Amino acid sequence: MEPARIDGAPTVWSAQLADIPPGRSAKFQIHWQKRMVEGFVVNVEGRYFAYVNHCPHAGTPLDWWPNEFFTRDRRFLTCGTHGSLFEPESGKCAGGPCNGRALFPLPVQITDDRIVVIGSNV
């Protein structure tokens, strides 16, 4: 879906829930706090969580392959740069060099059969 735009910047991203099955993810661009950021949403057993695609340790995108954020067993999100592990439900570091840090969450709303991530103009 094409994001809604205010002043040329996407402020809302949405997708069909069916397009993000359990253990999978989707990337998007959104306007957040006066800048464009790449975000991603993950489906954890029917619960959806969204984060900025930025490792708090390495400062690089997390995906180890395009749009792949989960470890092979789908228990954690992982940073492809140095192998930091993050809890998908909270974004908190679960292991590796990210110790004490967490991913930056983005607000998620579920409406009918869609997931909606809302950005910010301020």
What are these regions (language model features)?
Residues F69-T78, C93-R101:
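Short cysteine/histidine-rich metal-coordination sites, predominantly Zn2+-binding motifs
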Residues F86-E87, G95:
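Short beta-strand His + acidic residue motifs that chelate non-heme Fe in jelly-roll/DSBH
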Residues C55, C79-H82:
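Short cysteine clusters
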Residues M1-R72, E87-P88, A102-V122:
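N-terminal pre-ligand scaffold of iron-sulfur
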